[in-house]
């Protein structure tokens, strides 16, 4: 079995009747899978995001993050057709400014019903990335 954890964060999302996040080490612990599952009774906009100091380049459902000579590849595995975008992570006072910080986003507009967002994060390994993506299974089966 793969090392994994699932957290119920429904109380943080009033628009969802259920909201779960799973994190698993996959592909012989060479990658991390972040998977969110939400039950949304009405259409809403959902944004999956990660904040980083890295330089970020996107290409549809893929992104490469570079920092201090290291690379991390991000790929949206679900839903089909979803794409990444990048925005500034800088904030206004009185918050910490976060100069140079970026946010890698996957935004779903009019999301409704059973919604799954799955993002695979893979460091750049010397022997290259894994050849295939892991199978996406419901969090209840983790």
Which role does the model predict for each range below?
Residues 1-142:
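CBM-like, beta-strand-rich accessory domains located in the C-terminal region of large
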């Amino acid at each position: 079995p793969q090392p994994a954890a699932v957290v119920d964060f429904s109380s943080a999302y009033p628009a969802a009747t259920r909201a779960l996040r799973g994190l698993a080490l996959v592909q012989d612990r060479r990658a991390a899978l972040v998977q969110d599952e939400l039950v949304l009774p009405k259409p809403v906009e959902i944004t999956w995001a990660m904040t980083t100091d890295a330089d970020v380049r996107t290409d549809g459902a893929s992104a490469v993050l570079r920092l201090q000579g290291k690379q991390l590849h991000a790929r949206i595995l679900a839903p089909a057709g979803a794409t990444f975008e990048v925005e500034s992570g800088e904030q206004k006072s009185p918050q910490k400014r976060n100069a140079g910080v970026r946010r890698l986003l996957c935004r779903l507009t009019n999301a409704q019903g059973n919604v799954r967002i799955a993002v695979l994060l893979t460091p750049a390994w010397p022997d290259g990335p894994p050849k295939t993506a892991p199978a996406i299974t419901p969090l209840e089966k983790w």
